[in-house]
């Protein structure tokens, strides 16, 4: 029998072709712009805006990235001197005072601080690590026109008056294996341009502005911590930190302190970011930190963290250079920095002022936690977390009540077909009923949701087992596999269900299920908002709001149906006539009809015999419907159909509007794509290459599977109307991408595997071991390719969550033979032990280095570094003692004097010997000259094109000598 359908001439009808085309077009119309926004950086303007010079900025970036410039390198000193020169050039190039007068301003006072005096000893919280660091920071202070003219910082007891200023920070050191273009060269040149901008007439700041070029960020955020010891650090109450956790692309707002300090970022021409990234940082999904934690956590400032985030494969490698970034990326960070800083320095309120604090931190006040996100990289939304909480609670209460009231109204109007299997004619005593089949479709949703989602989760485990790093280079192959599998299975399951039990209520029941599921998620999100201050679930509110409206429309749609009693009466009329003519309004096809015995003319029933049908009481009328027990009316699937009825759905569905589904789809799918789509892309970019850092690979695949469900779950109410074309195409896509994801090599020249290098030398014996850490077995394969490993036994052990493969390396030449003929002369130390107390004094120096450390076999109780400053905001000893003391100096060949104290009973409990024991280690990090670290040169030369090299620790070469007292 032919399967009738609604008129194909209606372009908005709920029929296969309109549903397929409209849903596909809407998804493409939103997904494509999201991808473009995520991957394409807005072009820099053809001419520089007033107060900026992009040509200068690009030239500065090229000069800055001329070589590796970690703190412990001679190139770092060159960068320091170059920065001072450039800063003075920019200040000298400021217009004369007369030009400021023409716009009603005064030329601002500018003070440059070259801090070569500050130092600090501090500890890593709970890590058993102590650090002594000497500053080479550069600070530029542009006095605000609202500030007084006193030079308060020259008074040892001086304090800034008036409202707090603004700090903009970038670090000018790089890692020893990266040129530092985006980490943090773009931030540095942005700060240079801010000097130019805020010394231009018309841009003089209201509040004081401090531009900090800090040195030593890469080695435990040392530069930001020692900045706290300079008097100018008392001025700023707010800050903007410019960073790079990737290598190019867009600069994203990673995190911020509160809603008030975030609002100036709304001025950015191309805002980018989501509060969910801040929650991800707090959860430790990204295994790195920025100076933000020092300024906010240790100093008490309120501010923002803007950073590049991808690709992490280039982060801290030689591909973090000017060639792999662009002027567009420079402009994206610079424009955001200008807009945000201008908003902060022009603020006339007292919102960033607070009561004095007893802990010594800045009295910057406190603001409400914020919720923030961008919309297509063009607009930025900021509101307070308690607003989100209030909206969430309101919607949690109002939405169910609205549906409940609507359901009651439907019931009173006798139009509540949902959950109704039958209805009685109006004048019936209840013994005669007409089938409605209103329950059909209610139990489909769990299968529609669980089966596709379970398969995608299974795919996540499958890929993790056989090719866990494929997402490193082929993230969209993984996405394509997940999406194609999910959509095809959802379509297949829905088509099977629709074929077996067709229902006009598939849409309303699926939306009702979605409403219930999302209501539960909104409850969870609201609890986390209230209890833990987590705002990352903001998207649930908007998605739930759209689903609620779509569900409500489905309920309102039922008012278009006839009253159930009228409908049943109209169907029952033929059974009460002797005529063979009858109504077919109630015929619902797809039901099998069993013939029963005819009634006698007087309505009596023939006496039952052994030949009587077992279905006695079920009677076929002249109208071809059937009475079951109690005159239950049924239909015959051979009956002629209503012309506007779709398929074998219930006959009463012809009264339902045919276009409403479009409105429902537009209320659900676009909201999901707009709010969840950017989060999916952000999470993929931020985490897809973290497996090489030791993070669990399974997490990102599970996240992709879960996000696939979130992104495509709006299709479930409509997908049973899909034609077979797109699902079958997706089945082919799934087959191809599954094979590719299981067998393809996971790395490429554009997405290299990052390996971590270190060479450790025993200066007493001359024995050295070069090591590479990284993903196994690839790290072993790379080590085996090196000429120096031929014939050697490469040993691989687990270290710092990563396999570490070591071999006897080519001896380093970090100290020239003319300076020291023997390796043991590279490092000198002297230890003097107290005769009466468990104390000792160590004097340590290294040749051609300004970084050493002392590693103890057992934690010491206390230590003091000669001439060091101490600050109660930065405890210098961990609660469980100190096992390692890192020593940094601004001078080459410096001698550190360290006094240590250990437990009084240590001599009695030490099985290794009396007193104190451990290693003195010096670090060499300058890899700019070939032949200085030949083992590293060999790795760079012979490693495959799909592998890159980064540093494992602060030093590329670590030379050690043992001590015992």
From Swiss-Prot:
Glycans are attached at residues 53, 119, 793, 830. It is a multi-pass membrane protein. Residues 1-16, 409-441, 494-507, 554-661, 720-725 are cytoplasmic. The record marks 315 as: Transition state stabilizer. The keyword Repressor does not apply. One of its GO terms (cellular component) is vacuolar membrane. Its main location: membrane. The chain crosses the membrane at residues 17-37, 388-408, 442-462, 473-493, 508-528, 533-553, 662-682, 699-719, 726-746. Its cofactor is Zn(2+). Residues 591-604 have a biased composition (Acidic residues). It is found in: Vacuole membrane. The keyword Cytoplasm does not apply. GO terms for biological process: proteolysis. Residues 38-387, 463-472, 529-532, 683-698, 747-965 are vacuolar. Belongs to the peptidase M28 family. May be involved in vacuolar sorting and osmoregulation. This is Vacuolar membrane protease. It comes from Aspergillus fumigatus (strain ATCC MYA-4609 / CBS 101355 / FGSC A1100 / Af293) (Neosartorya fumigata).
């Amino acid at each position: 029998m032919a399967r009738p359908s609604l008129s194909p001439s209606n372009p908005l009808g709920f029929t296969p072709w309109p549903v397929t085309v409209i849903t596909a077009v809407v998804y493409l119309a939103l997904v494509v712009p999201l991808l473009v926004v995520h991957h394409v950086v807005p072009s820099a303007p053809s001419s520089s805006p007033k107060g900026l010079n992009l040509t200068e900025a690009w030239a500065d970036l090229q000069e800055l990235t001329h070589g590796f410039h970690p703190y412990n390198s001679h190139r770092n000193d060159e960068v320091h001197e170059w920065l001072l020169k450039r800063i003075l050039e920019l200040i000298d190039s400021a217009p004369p005072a007369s030009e400021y007068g023409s716009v009603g301003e005064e030329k601002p006072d500018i003070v440059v601080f070259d801090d070569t005096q500050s130092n600090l000893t501090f500890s890593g919280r709970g890590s058993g690590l102590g650090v002594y660091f000497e500053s080479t920071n550069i600070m530029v202070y542009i006095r605000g026109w609202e500030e007084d003219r006193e030079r308060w910082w020259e008074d040892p007891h001086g304090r800034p008056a008036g409202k707090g200023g603004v700090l903009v920070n970038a670090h000018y050191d790089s890692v020893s294996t990266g040129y530092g273009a985006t980490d943090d060269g773009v931030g540095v040149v942005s700060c240079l341009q801010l000097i130019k901008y805020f010394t231009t007439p018309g841009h003089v700041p209201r509040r004081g502005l401090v531009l900090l070029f800090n040195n030593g960020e890469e080695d435990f955020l040392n530069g930001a911590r020692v900045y706290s010891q300079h008097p100018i650090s008392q001025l700023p109450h707010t800050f903007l930190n410019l960073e790079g956790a990737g290598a190019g692309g867009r600069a994203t707002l990673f995190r911020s302190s509160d809603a008030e300090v975030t609002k100036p970022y709304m001025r950015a021409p191309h805002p980018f970011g989501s509060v969910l990234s801040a929650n991800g940082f707090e959860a430790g999904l990204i295994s790195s930190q920025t100076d933000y934690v020092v300024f906010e956590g240790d100093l008490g400032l309120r501010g923002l963290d803007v950073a590049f985030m991808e690709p992490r494969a280039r982060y801290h490698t030689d591909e973090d250079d000017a060639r792999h970034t662009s002027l567009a990326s420079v402009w994206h960070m610079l424009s955001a920095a200008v807009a945000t800083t201008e908003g902060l320095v022009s603020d006339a309120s007292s919102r960033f002022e607070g009561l004095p604090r007893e802990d010594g931190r800045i009295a910057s006040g406190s603001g409400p936690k914020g919720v923030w996100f961008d919309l297509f990289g063009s607009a930025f939304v900021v509101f307070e977390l308690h607003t989100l909480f209030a909206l969430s609670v309101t919607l949690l209460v109002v939405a169910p009540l609205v549906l409940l009231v609507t359901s009651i109204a439907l019931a009173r109007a006798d139009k509540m077909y949902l959950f109704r299997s039958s209805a009685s004619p109006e004048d019936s005593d209840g013994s005669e009923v007409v089938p409605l089949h209103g329950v059909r479709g209610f139990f489909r949703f769990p299968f529609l949701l669980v089966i596709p989602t379970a398969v995608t989760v299974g795919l996540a485990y499958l890929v993790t087992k056989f090719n866990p790093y494929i997402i490193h280079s082929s993230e969209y192959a993984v996405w394509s596999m997940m999406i194609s599998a999910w959509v095809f299975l959802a379509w297949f399951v829905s088509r099977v269900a629709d074929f077996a039990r067709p229902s006009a209520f598939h849409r309303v029941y699926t939306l009702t299920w979605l409403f219930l599921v999302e209501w539960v998620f909104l409850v969870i999100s609201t609890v986390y908002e209230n209890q833990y201050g987590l705002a990352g679930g903001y998207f649930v509110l908007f998605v739930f709001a759209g689903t609620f409206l779509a569900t409500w429309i489905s309920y309102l749609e039922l008012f278009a149906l006839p009253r159930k009693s009228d409908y049943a009466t109209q169907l029952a009329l033929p059974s009460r006539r002797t005529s063979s003519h009858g109504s077919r309004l109630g015929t619902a096809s797809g039901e099998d009809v069993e013939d029963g015995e005819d009634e006698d003319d007087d309505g009596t029933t023939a006496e039952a015999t052994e030949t009587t049908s077992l279905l006695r009481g079920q009677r076929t009328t002249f109208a071809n419907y059937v009475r079951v027990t109690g005159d239950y009316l049924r239909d015959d699937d051979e009956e002629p159909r209503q012309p506007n009825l779709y398929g074998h759905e219930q006959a009463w569905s012809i009264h339902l509007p045919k276009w409403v589904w479009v409105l429902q789809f537009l209320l659900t799918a676009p909201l999901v794509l707009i709010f969840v789509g950017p989060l999916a892309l952000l999470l993929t970019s931020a985490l897809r290459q973290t497996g090489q850092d030791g993070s669990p690979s399974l997490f990102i695949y599970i996240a992709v599977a879960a996000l696939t469900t979130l992104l495509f779950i709006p299709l479930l109410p409509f997908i049973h109307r899909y034609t077979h074309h797109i699902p079958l195409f997706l089945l082919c896509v799934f087959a191809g991408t599954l094979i590719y994801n299981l067998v393809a090599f996971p790395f490429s020249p554009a997405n290299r595997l990052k390996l971590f290098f270190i060479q450790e030398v025993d200066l007493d014996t001359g024995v050295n071991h070069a090591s590479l850490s990284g993903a196994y077995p690839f790290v072993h394969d790379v080590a085996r390719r090196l000429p120096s490993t031929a014939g050697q036994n490469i040993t691989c052990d687990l270290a710092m969550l990563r396999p570490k493969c070591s071999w006897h390396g080519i001896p380093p030449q970090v100290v020239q033979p003319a300076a020291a003929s023997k390796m043991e002369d590279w490092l000198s130390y002297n230890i003097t032990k107290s005769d009466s107390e468990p104390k000792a004094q160590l004097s340590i120096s290294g040749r051609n280095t300004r970084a050493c450390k002392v590693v103890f076999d057992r934690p010491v109780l206390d230590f003091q570094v000669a001439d060091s400053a101490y600050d109660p905001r930065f405890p210098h000893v961990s609660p469980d003692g100190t096992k390692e003391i890192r020593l940094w100096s601004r001078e080459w060949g410096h001698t550190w004097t360290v006094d240590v104290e250990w437990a009084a009973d240590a001599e009695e409990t030490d099985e290794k010997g009396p007193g104190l024991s451990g290693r003195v280690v010096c670090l060499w990090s300058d890899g700019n000259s070939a032949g200085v670290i030949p083992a590293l040169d060999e790795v760079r030369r012979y490693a495959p094109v799909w592998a890159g090299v980064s540093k494992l620790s602060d030093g590329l070469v670590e030379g050690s000598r043992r001590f015992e007292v």
